[in-house]
Each structure stands twice: as structure tokens, then as C-alpha cells.
Amino acid sequence: MNTLQYYISCFTSMNCNKYRGQVAPHKAMMLIAVMDEIYNGYLTNGFVPHNDGMVKAFESAWRRYVGKSSVFNPVFATPFFHLSSEPFWKLMKSDSYVEKKEYSLGALRESFYGAKLPDDLCQYMAEPASRQRLKRALLDKFVPNWNDNENKWMVAESEIEYKSSDKKNSFRMVA
């Protein structure tokens, strides 16, 4: 079993694109979305789907922490695919897998069933104190001004609540 510190180190040393002097926050927002989905009970076995619920969770994390960016756009398929270069994110190839350098959401869904995370990482993401440390490490590294956003969002779990009628598509953010 890897330690929490190992995953914090993996998260903070991720290989991310840089543009105009800024590090792309896409991978960090994807991981925060995964943590939110684990916290809310929508991901339970380490399998990360690329369904509409996951897309909405990613977009919600982006709005919450990145806000409007003049440099980056919240494109879901990019971090979902490129996280496969990290030691903890394994893409699960489908029978219709086609190798590409970049994937649109449709092509991603056609070529991969989803992604798989190690069990120990999922345990850390599910445990409140560990999840808090993982989130904080991601935000401090990849969204250094996250605490200056106009909404002053905090990492605390109680601030965000997802309501879902089918655990898949219908989410609303409650502040």
C-alpha cells in the first residue's frame, strides 16, 4: 500500500501543460471531481466513468476553483486521457480502442470504458482528512489563487452538496 504522502507527491509533480506562464489546472480539477464523486457516493470501486455525471462534476470543480480563465477552458476529455501518463490513472481500453494523440469526448467514450484508480488512493480520497490534504495539495500547486476567487470557496466538504435524482445526470450546486 502506498502512503498518502506518496500520492500527494504524485499529485504535485504531475506533468501538466503550461501556457502563458500558467500551469494547466485540468488534471487537478479532474482529480478533485473524482474526490467529490467518491465523497458523494457515486464512485465506489475505483472505476472512473466518462459519463455525463462525471463531466458535470469536472465542470463544477472548474467553476468552483478556477472560475473564468482567459488562458484555459474546461475540456473534460483532455485531462481524462492525459492523466494516463501519471502512475495512478489507468485507462481501460474498450474493444473498439483506436490509438490517438488526442481524444474528443465521443472518441474517448468509444476507445475507453473509463479509468481505474488504485484501491489505496480511493481509500484516501474517501477518508475526510486525507481527502482534504489531497485537495489542498492540488489547489495550492495548480490553482495558486484559488482562495482569491470571487466566491471565496473553501475546501471544506460541507460547502458543496450534490443533489441527484438518478446519481448520473442531475446535479445542482448548493452554497
Task: Report each predicted region and the residues it spans.
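Intrinsically disordered, charged low-complexity linkers and terminal tails
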Residues: M1-A175
